[in-house]
Regions:
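A generic structural motif
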Residues: 100-101, 140-146
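Non-catalytic DNA-recognition/assembly elements of restriction-modification systems
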Residues: 1-27, 35-52, 144-185
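DNA target-recognition domains and sequence-specific DNA-contacting regions of bacterial/archaeal
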Residues: 13, 18-137
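An amphipathic, hydrophobic-aromatic interaction surface with interspersed Lys/Arg
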Residues: 135-142, 154
Length: 185
Protein backbone atom coordinates (compact mmCIF):
# COMPACT_ATOMS: atom_id res chain seq x y z
CA UNK A 1 0.00 0.00 0.00
CA UNK A 2 2.91 2.33 -0.53
CA UNK A 3 1.31 3.67 -3.70
CA UNK A 4 -0.67 6.83 -3.01
CA UNK A 5 -4.33 5.99 -3.49
CA UNK A 6 -6.38 8.88 -4.80
CA UNK A 7 -10.10 9.33 -5.23
CA UNK A 8 -9.49 11.57 -8.22
CA UNK A 9 -7.68 9.02 -10.40
CA UNK A 10 -10.63 6.64 -10.34
CA UNK A 11 -13.64 6.25 -12.53
CA UNK A 12 -16.89 6.55 -10.59
CA UNK A 13 -20.33 5.26 -11.41
CA UNK A 14 -23.83 5.80 -10.09
CA UNK A 15 -25.49 2.69 -8.64
CA UNK A 16 -29.11 2.12 -7.64
CA UNK A 17 -28.84 1.34 -3.94
CA UNK A 18 -31.36 -1.51 -3.96
CA UNK A 19 -29.64 -3.21 -6.90
CA UNK A 20 -26.26 -3.17 -5.19
CA UNK A 21 -27.36 -4.04 -1.67
CA UNK A 22 -29.92 -6.28 -0.02
CA UNK A 23 -31.90 -3.90 2.19
CA UNK A 24 -34.31 -5.22 4.80
CA UNK A 25 -35.79 -4.40 8.15
CA UNK A 26 -33.95 -5.71 11.17
CA UNK A 27 -34.62 -9.28 12.31
CA UNK A 28 -34.94 -8.36 15.98
CA UNK A 29 -36.55 -4.92 16.52
CA UNK A 30 -36.88 -5.17 20.29
CA UNK A 31 -38.38 -2.30 22.27
CA UNK A 32 -35.81 -1.42 24.94
CA UNK A 33 -38.44 -1.81 27.68
CA UNK A 34 -38.70 -5.51 26.77
CA UNK A 35 -34.97 -6.25 27.04
CA UNK A 36 -33.76 -8.74 29.62
CA UNK A 37 -30.20 -9.12 30.89
CA UNK A 38 -28.55 -5.77 30.35
CA UNK A 39 -25.04 -7.01 31.18
CA UNK A 40 -24.34 -9.26 28.18
CA UNK A 41 -21.99 -9.23 25.20
CA UNK A 42 -24.47 -8.63 22.37
CA UNK A 43 -24.66 -5.08 21.00
CA UNK A 44 -28.12 -3.49 21.10
CA UNK A 45 -28.22 -1.04 18.18
CA UNK A 46 -30.55 1.96 18.18
CA UNK A 47 -30.98 5.06 16.03
CA UNK A 48 -28.49 6.98 18.18
CA UNK A 49 -25.76 8.87 16.36
CA UNK A 50 -23.09 8.00 18.94
CA UNK A 51 -21.09 4.89 19.87
CA UNK A 52 -21.64 3.22 16.49
CA UNK A 53 -25.35 3.16 17.30
CA UNK A 54 -24.73 0.90 20.31
CA UNK A 55 -27.06 1.77 23.18
CA UNK A 56 -25.90 -1.04 25.48
CA UNK A 57 -24.75 -4.67 25.55
CA UNK A 58 -27.32 -7.32 26.39
CA UNK A 59 -27.67 -11.04 27.04
CA UNK A 60 -29.24 -13.39 24.49
CA UNK A 61 -32.90 -12.42 24.11
CA UNK A 62 -35.17 -15.50 24.07
CA UNK A 63 -37.74 -15.30 21.29
CA UNK A 64 -35.64 -12.92 19.17
CA UNK A 65 -32.96 -13.61 16.60
CA UNK A 66 -29.82 -11.57 16.21
CA UNK A 67 -29.05 -9.78 13.00
CA UNK A 68 -26.03 -11.16 11.19
CA UNK A 69 -22.55 -9.69 11.36
CA UNK A 70 -20.70 -7.71 8.68
CA UNK A 71 -23.55 -5.40 7.68
CA UNK A 72 -24.37 -1.70 7.61
CA UNK A 73 -27.28 -0.36 9.66
CA UNK A 74 -29.37 2.70 8.88
CA UNK A 75 -31.63 4.36 11.44
CA UNK A 76 -34.70 5.38 9.48
CA UNK A 77 -35.79 8.45 11.40
CA UNK A 78 -32.33 9.71 12.30
CA UNK A 79 -30.42 8.70 9.15
CA UNK A 80 -27.62 7.22 11.27
CA UNK A 81 -25.34 4.85 9.35
CA UNK A 82 -22.87 2.43 10.94
CA UNK A 83 -20.94 -0.77 10.22
CA UNK A 84 -21.70 -3.68 12.55
CA UNK A 85 -19.00 -6.36 12.77
CA UNK A 86 -20.54 -8.76 15.33
CA UNK A 87 -24.09 -10.16 15.38
CA UNK A 88 -26.45 -7.75 17.16
CA UNK A 89 -29.98 -6.93 18.28
CA UNK A 90 -31.74 -3.69 17.40
CA UNK A 91 -34.42 -1.33 18.47
CA UNK A 92 -37.14 -0.17 16.10
CA UNK A 93 -36.82 1.42 12.66
CA UNK A 94 -33.40 0.04 11.78
CA UNK A 95 -32.65 -1.14 8.25
CA UNK A 96 -29.91 -3.68 7.57
CA UNK A 97 -27.76 -3.37 4.43
CA UNK A 98 -25.99 -6.47 3.11
CA UNK A 99 -23.57 -7.23 0.30
CA UNK A 100 -21.26 -10.28 0.25
CA UNK A 101 -18.33 -8.02 -0.72
CA UNK A 102 -18.57 -5.89 2.43
CA UNK A 103 -15.76 -5.93 4.95
CA UNK A 104 -14.76 -3.61 7.77
CA UNK A 105 -12.81 -1.30 5.49
CA UNK A 106 -14.88 -0.97 2.34
CA UNK A 107 -18.00 -0.66 4.51
CA UNK A 108 -16.52 2.49 6.03
CA UNK A 109 -15.99 3.87 2.52
CA UNK A 110 -19.54 2.97 1.47
CA UNK A 111 -20.97 4.51 4.66
CA UNK A 112 -19.68 7.91 3.57
CA UNK A 113 -21.50 7.54 0.24
CA UNK A 114 -24.66 6.40 2.04
CA UNK A 115 -24.51 9.39 4.39
CA UNK A 116 -24.36 11.73 1.39
CA UNK A 117 -27.45 10.01 -0.02
CA UNK A 118 -29.56 9.88 3.18
CA UNK A 119 -28.87 13.46 4.28
CA UNK A 120 -31.82 14.58 2.12
CA UNK A 121 -34.21 12.60 4.33
CA UNK A 122 -35.71 14.08 7.46
CA UNK A 123 -37.61 13.09 10.56
CA UNK A 124 -41.32 12.73 9.85
CA UNK A 125 -42.90 13.03 6.43
CA UNK A 126 -39.79 12.47 4.29
CA UNK A 127 -37.93 9.78 6.22
CA UNK A 128 -35.62 7.08 4.88
CA UNK A 129 -38.22 4.40 4.07
CA UNK A 130 -37.29 1.03 2.57
CA UNK A 131 -38.73 2.08 -0.79
CA UNK A 132 -36.80 5.35 -0.84
CA UNK A 133 -33.59 3.59 0.16
CA UNK A 134 -33.96 0.94 -2.53
CA UNK A 135 -34.59 3.52 -5.28
CA UNK A 136 -31.83 5.87 -4.17
CA UNK A 137 -28.52 6.25 -5.96
CA UNK A 138 -24.95 6.40 -4.73
CA UNK A 139 -21.64 6.98 -6.50
CA UNK A 140 -18.78 4.54 -5.99
CA UNK A 141 -15.39 3.98 -7.63
CA UNK A 142 -15.45 1.19 -10.21
CA UNK A 143 -13.09 -1.51 -11.43
CA UNK A 144 -12.30 -2.33 -15.07
CA UNK A 145 -15.59 -4.26 -15.35
CA UNK A 146 -17.70 -1.28 -14.27
CA UNK A 147 -18.47 -2.89 -10.91
CA UNK A 148 -17.80 -1.34 -7.49
CA UNK A 149 -14.07 -1.51 -6.80
CA UNK A 150 -14.31 -3.16 -3.39
CA UNK A 151 -10.54 -3.72 -3.23
CA UNK A 152 -9.73 -0.06 -3.87
CA UNK A 153 -12.28 1.05 -1.26
CA UNK A 154 -10.72 -1.34 1.30
CA UNK A 155 -7.17 -0.29 0.49
CA UNK A 156 -8.10 3.39 0.62
CA UNK A 157 -9.64 3.07 4.08
CA UNK A 158 -6.73 0.95 5.34
CA UNK A 159 -4.39 3.73 4.27
CA UNK A 160 -6.51 6.32 6.08
CA UNK A 161 -6.45 4.13 9.19
CA UNK A 162 -2.65 3.72 9.03
CA UNK A 163 -2.10 7.46 8.52
CA UNK A 164 -4.38 8.25 11.47
CA UNK A 165 -2.61 5.71 13.71
CA UNK A 166 0.79 7.05 12.69
CA UNK A 167 -0.29 10.61 13.58
CA UNK A 168 -1.65 9.45 16.95
CA UNK A 169 1.52 7.52 17.77
CA UNK A 170 3.69 10.48 16.79
CA UNK A 171 1.56 12.80 18.89
CA UNK A 172 1.79 10.66 22.03
CA UNK A 173 5.39 9.50 21.60
CA UNK A 174 7.77 11.44 23.86
CA UNK A 175 10.13 13.59 21.83
CA UNK A 176 12.84 13.86 24.48
CA UNK A 177 13.51 13.12 28.15
CA UNK A 178 12.11 16.46 29.31
CA UNK A 179 8.69 15.53 27.95
CA UNK A 180 8.59 12.19 29.76
CA UNK A 181 6.64 11.95 32.97
CA UNK A 182 8.67 11.04 36.01
CA UNK A 183 7.36 9.48 39.14
CA UNK A 184 7.60 11.04 42.57
CA UNK A 185 9.42 9.41 45.36
Amino acid sequence: MSKKLKLTDREWKEFVFGELFDISSTSSSIDKKRLTGLQGNNPYITRSDTNNGIDCFIDHQPGFVTDEANVITIGLDTQTVFYQSPPFYTGQNIQVIRNPNLNKYNALFVIRAIKMFVKKFSWGSYGATLTRLRKGKIFLPIDTNGEPDWTFMSDFMKRIEQETLRKAIDFFKPRNDKQMLTGGG
